[in-house]
Curated annotation (Swiss-Prot):
Record topological domains on the Mitochondrial intermembrane side: 35-40, 106-128, 184-190, 257-261
Name of the protein in its database record: Cytochrome c oxidase subunit 3
Family, per entry: Belongs to the cytochrome c oxidase subunit 3 family.
Species name: Antilope cervicapra
One protein family per Pfam: COX3
Gene: MT-CO3
GO CC terms of this entry: mitochondrial inner membrane; respiratory chain complex IV
Cellular localisation: Mitochondrion inner membrane
Described purpose of this protein according to its UniProt entry: Component of the cytochrome c oxidase, the last enzyme in the mitochondrial electron transport chain which drives oxidative phosphorylation. The respiratory chain contains 3 multisubunit complexes succinate dehydrogenase (complex II, CII), ubiquinol-cytochrome c oxidoreductase (cytochrome b-c1 complex, complex III, CIII) and cytochrome c oxidase (complex IV, CIV), that cooperate to transfer electrons derived from NADH and succinate to molecular oxygen, creating an electrochemical gradient over the inner membrane that drives transmembrane transport and the ATP synthase.
Transmembrane portions of the chain: 16-34, 41-66, 73-105, 129-152, 156-183, 191-223, 233-256
Keyword Glycosyltransferase: no
Mitochondrial matrix topological segments: 1-15, 67-72, 153-155, 224-232
Reactions accelerated catalytically: 4 Fe(II)-[cytochrome c] + O2 + 8 H(+)(in) = 4 Fe(III)-[cytochrome c] + 2 H2O + 4 H(+)(out)
Enzyme class per UniProt: translocase
Quaternary structure annotation from Swiss-Prot or TrEMBL: Component of the cytochrome c oxidase (complex IV, CIV), a multisubunit enzyme composed of 14 subunits. The complex is composed of a catalytic core of 3 subunits MT-CO1, MT-CO2 and MT-CO3, encoded in the mitochondrial DNA, and 11 supernumerary subunits COX4I, COX5A, COX5B, COX6A, COX6B, COX6C, COX7A, COX7B, COX7C, COX8 and NDUFA4, which are encoded in the nuclear genome.
Length: 261
């Protein structure tokens, strides 16, 4: 930071916003090609471009923060605000799904048989796999908090252990959810019940996969001694995101699985 007299990070010109925008265009065009022409070539190209962009952009962020020291307290404050706003936007995203669910379930139309779940739908038992999923995510919330406290206290081994447990629980949750989808007696095309169930729980599952990936990156960074007790925003952001995923699941469980059944 010797070459500047302020605490802010003046970012160097980067190609990643451009390649990110290109990947978004390729993915959306690819989805249309897949839906209408059953061709996945453009979609795969878009997904590959997106993955490469994310990998290289975040690699640059890690270089700037860990090795070049650009992430001063002022910069970290801005990143914190950014992460908080991102999580708020995700809350509003899920609010739309809950709105759709309650709009359909609180006043079922005659087409649904005037009842909820609609006539002919056999909902999943909330006291079986969904309850196990709930306990798995709650346990992962405890282990990520243990990891955070261990990091604050400078206990590297405990932090790695707790982080590994959290990742394992996240993967276990994803596998349970996949098996539940496979065995579900209804599909996404079974009216508004199937739509709201699979879209809401499916997007939550996607967020669990994203959160698990975020934590895996943090795990490998910690193996390379990237985090200290007073400089670890990358891990902190991952922990906040994981707690958000946790809370959304509790609302999904109570609304869709328990009350909705």
């Amino acid at each position: 930071m010797t070459h500047q007299t302020h605490a802010y990070h003046m970012v160097n010109p980067s190609p990643w916003p451009l390649t990110g925008a290109l990947s978004a265009l390729l993915m959306t065009s690819g989805l249309i090609m897949w839906f209408h022409f059953n061709s996945t070539t453009l979609l795969m190209l878009g997904l590959t471009t997106n993955m490469l962009t994310m990998y290289q952009w975040w690699r640059d962020v890690i270089r700037e923060s860990t090795f070049q020291g650009h992430h001063t307290p002022n910069v970290q404050k801005g990143l914190r605000y950014g992460m908080i706003l991102f999580i708020i936007s995700e809350v509003l995203f899920f609010t739309g799904f809950f709105w759709a669910f309650y709009h359909s379930s609180l006043a079922p139309t005659p087409e649904l048989g005037g009842c909820w779940p609609p006539t002919g739908i056999h909902p999943l038992n909330p006291l079986e796999v969904p309850l196990l999923n709930t306990s798995v995510l709650l346990a992962s919330g405890v282990s990520i908090t243990w990891a955070h406290h261990s990091l604050m206290e400078g206990n590297r081994n405990h932090m790695l252990q707790a982080l590994f447990i959290t990742i394992a629980l996240g993967v276990y949750f994803t596998l349970l959810q996949a098996s539940e989808y496979y065995e579900a007696p209804f599909t996404i095309s079974d009216g508004v019940y199937g739509s709201t169930f699979f879209v809401a729980t499916g997007f939550h599952g996607l967020h669990v996969i994203i959160g698990s990936t975020f934590l895996i990156v943090c795990f490998f960074r910690q193996l390379k001694f990237h985090f200290t007790s007073n400089h670890h925003f990358g891990f902190e952001a991952a922990a906040w995101y994981w707690h958000f995923v946790d809370v959304v699941w509790l609302f999904l469980y109570v609304s869709i699985y328990w009350w909705g059944s």
